[in-house]
Swiss-Prot record:
Keyword entries, A-Z: Chloroplast, Plastid, Ribonucleoprotein, Ribosomal protein, RNA-binding, rRNA-binding
Similarity comment text for this entry: Belongs to the universal ribosomal protein uS7 family.
Molecular function in Gene Ontology: rRNA binding; structural constituent of ribosome
Source superkingdom: Eukaryota
Described function: One of the primary rRNA binding proteins, it binds directly to 16S rRNA where it nucleates assembly of the head domain of the 30S subunit.
Pfam families per the UniProt record, alphabetical: Ribosomal_S7
The protein, known as: Small ribosomal subunit protein uS7cz/uS7cy
Signal sequence coordinates: none
Subcellular location: Plastid, Chloroplast
SUPFAM superfamilies: Ribosomal protein S7
Length: 155
C-alpha cells in the first residue's frame, strides 16, 4: 500500500470561447499528434454548423447529445474460475461523460462526409434527437449489461 497521500482529482478546464468544460473535453479527445489549435478549429466549426442547422444554442444541443449518450451501466470482463464473465457495473457521472464523448467522436469518425467538423456536427444533432451510432452504442451496452445481470454478484 502506498504511503503517499491520495491525489486530488483534476478539474477540467474550460475552453476560451464558450467557457465550457464539455467543449474542452471534446477538444482533448479529438486531439491528434498534439495539434490542439486544429482540434479547437474543428470543434468550433462543428458548433457553428450546429447553430446553422438547428437554429438553437449549440451548447444546449451538445449537452443534450452527451446526456443522451451517457450510459448508466457498463460491462467489465472479470475472470472467475477459468472463464471470463462480462460483469455489469454502475458508472459514475465523470466516467459516463468520458465514455459518451469517446463514443460520439468514434461514431462521427466512422460517418461518411466531407470533413470532421461536418461529421461531428451531424452526429451531435442526431444524438440530441435520440438517433445515431453513439446512441446505438449506448443501447447495446445497456443490453449487454441486462443480459449479463446474473453475474452482477461477481463485482
Amino acid at each position: 500500500m502506498s504511503r503517499r497521500g491520495t491525489t486530488e482529482e483534476k478539474t477540467a478546464k474550460s475552453d476560451p470561447i464558450y467557457r465550457n468544460r464539455l467543449v474542452n473535453m471534446l477538444v482533448n479527445r479529438i486531439l491528434k499528434h498534439g495539434k490542439k489549435s486544429l482540434a479547437y478549429q474543428i470543434i468550433y466549426r462543428a458548433l457553428k454548423k450546429i447553430q446553422q442547422k438547428t437554429e438553437k444554442n449549440p451548447l444546449s444541443v451538445l449537452r443534450q447529445a452527451i446526456r443522451g449518450v451517457t450510459p448508466d451501466i457498463a460491462v467489465k470482463a472479470r475472470r472467475v474460475g477459468g472463464s471470463t464473465h462480462q460483469v455489469p457495473i454502475e458508472i459514475g457521472s465523470a466516467q459516463g461523460k468520458a465514455l459518451a464523448v469517446r463514443w460520439l467522436l468514434g461514431a462521427s469518425r466512422k460517418r461518411p462526409g466531407r470533413n470532421m467538423a461536418f461529421k461531428l456536427s451531424s452526429e451531435l444533432v442526431d444524438a440530441a434527437k435520440g438517433s445515431g451510432d453513439a446512441i446505438r452504442k449506448k443501447e447495446e451496452t445497456h443490453r449487454m449489461a441486462e443480459a449479463n445481470r446474473a453475474f452482477a454478484h461477481f463485482r
